[in-house]
Every structure is written in C-alpha cells, then in structure tokens.
Regions:
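Hydrophobic beta-strand core positions in alpha/beta domains
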Residues: 8, 81-82
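Phosphate-binding/catalytic loops
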Residues: 79, 85-142
Length: 142
C-alpha cells in the first residue's frame, strides 16, 4: 500500500507530534503529513522550547497551530504514528477501524517518546533528537 497521508499524535499537539510532523515533512515532501492531539490544546502554538529545538535543525515551527484529534483525521490517514503504547491502545479502543495503521513513532527501536511538556530545554533537546532518530527509522518503510 502506498502511503499518501500520515497523522502524528501526542497529547497536546504542541511538543512531540509537531516536531515529528515537521521532520517527516522534511523527509517526505510529497506526502500529506499532519499532527493532532488526543486532548489537543486547540489554537495554541508549538511550545517555545520545541520551536527552539527545531530551529537548531533549521526547521521553523512557528506557524504550527494545535488541533484536537477527531475521527476524520483517523479515517484520512494511511499511517498513524503515536508516542506511546498507551496512546496506541487508546486510539484502537476509541476508533477500532484504526487498528493495523497505528504504530509508535519509536516502533523500530521499541521505544516510547516521553512527554517533554513543562520540562527544561535539555529534556526538550533530548526528545527532539530521539524524534529525529525515530523519524529516520521510518524512512525505508514509508
């Protein structure tokens, strides 16, 4: 199956999922990639610390606006990347039709992506590097 639409999910859609979204867009410019939050902080911009991390990769996330996950996002996506096993279970229980297309971003390394929200810049930087690594792991599978 050819992947045309990728959805990246985290809790608030202001830290992890936008970072992954923007890294994926850089690697896959011809794929429709978006992000959303399970309990999205609707209308908020990306966290300043996340923006600072991404700036170091010359990726500008200042235009990101958080949105809340809904069934239409799930239906449209060919691949859904989440940050943890708990998020995967939540999606598959809430939207059973999502089974088979929901994977952890860190799937290939067997890792969850801890939430950096309200942590210091160093934690954000480490999270950003992990996300970049996990996104790279997906390159040969997309």
């Amino acid at each position: 199956m050819q992947i045309r639409n990728i959805l990246v999910i985290c809790v608030g859609n202001i830290c992890r999922s936008p970072m992954a979204e923007y890294f994926l867009k850089q690697n896959h410019p011809n794929i429709d990639i978006e992000s959303a939050g399970i309990s999205g902080m609707v209308g908020h911009s990306a966290d300043d610390k996340a923006i600072k991390c991404m700036d170091s990769f010359n990726i500008d996330m200042r235009q990101h606006i958080a949105k809340k996950l809904n069934a239409d996002h799930i239906k449209k996506a060919d691949l859904i990347l989440v940050m943890s096993q708990n998020q995967q279970k939540h999606l598959e229980q809430t939207w059973p039709f999502s089974k088979g297309k929901v994977f952890r971003l860190g799937h290939w390394q067997g890792k969850n992506v801890p939430d950096p929200y309200q942590h210091d810049q160093d934690f954000f930087n480490e999270t950003c590097l992990n996300i970049q690594s996990y996104v790279s792991d997906w390159k040969s599978h997309i």
